[in-house]
């Protein structure tokens, strides 16, 4: 059984017991989080597709950890002009473990 949920403006395919990284959620470590924006639920041959969301669909997850991703380096450079700008960015994420899929 798996579901497709919408979180942080992105779609994620999730299954029970799966651990995945999402955009930062405002929830404490160990807290339960519910995702009610379920786009699709599949259980074998039984497929439910929402328009846009599955009615009564809910995915429950537990927050495992918060952290920051790898650094992305940004460089702006203009040739022959002695002009160079450097910046870096580390995106915050929340790691969750899917505990239940209800549809």
From Swiss-Prot:
What GO molecular function annotations does the UniProt record carry, in alphabetical order?
A: rRNA binding; structural constituent of ribosome
The terms describing its cellular component in GO are:
cytoplasm; ribonucleoprotein complex; ribosome
The protein's UniProt keywords, in alphabetical order, are: Ribonucleoprotein, Ribosomal protein, RNA-binding, rRNA-binding
* Pfam families recorded: Ribosomal_L21p
Q: Which processes are annotated in GO (biological process)?
A: translation
Q: Assembly and partners?
A: Part of the 50S ribosomal subunit. Contacts protein L20.
Q: What does this protein do?
A: This protein binds to 23S rRNA in the presence of protein L20.
HAMAP family, alphabetically?
Ribosomal_bL21
Protein family membership:
Belongs to the bacterial ribosomal protein bL21 family.
This one is known as Large ribosomal subunit protein bL21
**Which gene is transcribed and translated to give this protein?**
rplU
């Amino acid at each position: 059984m798996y579901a497709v949920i919408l979180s942080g403006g992105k779609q994620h395919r999730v299954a029970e017991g799966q651990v995945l990284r999402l955009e930062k959620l405002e929830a404490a470590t160990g807290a339960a989080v519910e995702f009610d924006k379920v786009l699709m639920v599949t259980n074998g041959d039984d497929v439910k597709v929402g328009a846009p969301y599955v009615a009564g669909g809910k995915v429950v997850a537990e927050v495992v950890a918060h952290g920051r991703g790898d650094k992305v380096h940004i460089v702006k450079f203009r040739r022959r002009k002695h002009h160079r700008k450097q910046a870096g960015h580390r995106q915050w994420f929340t790691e969750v473990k899917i505990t239940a899929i209800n549809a």
